[in-house]
Amino acid sequence: MANVKLFDQTGKEVSSVELNDAIFGIEPNESVVFDVVISQRASLRQGTHAVKNRSAVSGGGRKPWRQKGTGRARQGSIRSPQWRGGGVVFGPTPRSYGYKLPQKVRRLALKSVYSAKVAEDKFVAVEGLSFAAPKTAEFAKVLSALSIDSKVLVIVEEGNEFAALSARNLPNVKVATATTASVLDIVNSDKLLVTKEAISTIEEVLA
């Protein structure tokens, strides 16, 4: 099993923590990670685009001129697609772009990105992140003590609301729990800051 250093909130190394090789030590599968990232990005699309077809455009109920005898082309409505201000043919309608991948694929992708971060030495384990009250300055001190100055995903245990509230005003910092951290979040971050309790939860969920 791989060992990573365990730090406290002041940046002092207090011990080490063993990581499960079946989760944090596998050969990353880039193809699977790519598929999951594309799936999660697709799910983020709003899909609220819409246009009006000829039945939705206002007006056009009356035939513009009689069928025969005018010398002009026959027309049934001024809202036909060929008219200016008419309905759109086969235009976009609101829809969801999201699609689901098999659970095994999603789990393998998570294991792959966690393993990649550990292998690249971009995985920082911390004993805990506890704050008496939501305080952005306190969270910034923790990051400074741990020499984290790049885009970071902080993974905490369930119920640690003060950590999330303390970090929400910091640029390039995102907080997630062990069960909500996504492959897209991990790929988009330069470093992972994970609490000891969150590591246990990750190993429990992905085992």
Swiss-Prot record:
Residues 49-78 are annotated as: Disordered. Belongs to the universal ribosomal protein uL4 family. One of its GO terms (molecular function) is structural constituent of ribosome. It comes from the Bacteria. InterPro entries: Ribosomal_uL4 (IPR002136), Ribosomal_uL4-like (IPR013005), Ribosomal_uL4_dom_sf (IPR023574). Pfam families: Ribosomal_L4. This is Large ribosomal subunit protein uL4. One of its GO terms (cellular component) is ribonucleoprotein complex. The gene is rplD. Part of the 50S ribosomal subunit. Signal peptide: none annotated. GO terms for biological process: translation. One of the primary rRNA binding proteins, this protein initially binds near the 5'-end of the 23S rRNA. It is important during the early stages of 50S assembly. It makes multiple contacts with different domains of the 23S rRNA in the assembled 50S subunit and ribosome. The lineage of its organism: Bacteria, Bacillati, Bacillota, Bacilli, Lactobacillales. Keywords: Ribonucleoprotein, Ribosomal protein, RNA-binding, rRNA-binding. PANTHER family: 50S RIBOSOMAL PROTEIN L4, LARGE RIBOSOMAL SUBUNIT PROTEIN UL4M.
